[in-house]
Amino acid sequence: MRGRLGALVVVALFTTALPAGAARNPGLPNARLTPGATNPAVRQATIHSTICVPGYSSSVRPSESYTERLKFAQLDGGYNLRGDTRASHYEEDHLIPLEVGGSPTAVANLWPEPRTIFWGAARKDRLENALHRLVCDGRVSLATAQRVFSVDWIAGYRRYVGP
């Protein structure tokens, strides 16, 4: 797995150059490098046996060694905020969260999300929790929640959490 992860990271980082200002907002990932990916086992029909079961996210979360290796490779490869490669300033995060059926290990769904900016990891975590509740309560469809994250989670925050 380690060799495969390294190969995927190299392909993802070096076949697509990261142009300056590629993200519309520094809190959003580069859509070409991180388009998002879903877990095929999670569908609208299975939410009550998957994501809505307490402990689901923990049961599918990849190991810290996997995500840390990926984070360092991405930061070193240029996927960072204005040249800041300090790992502590980032959380390797799932663009489409596990809580709404995001793929646990797909490189296309993982990115070094900044912690030190206004639209950073803490705000996205609030949206993840809010949409998870709405999906499990049947007030938002799974597909809608996944789309919020893959298109523009900041706009989703403003709509579902507040200003």
Locate each region found by the language model.
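Nuclease and nuclease-like effector domains acting on nucleic acids or nucleotide cofactors
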Residues: R2-E91, E99-P163
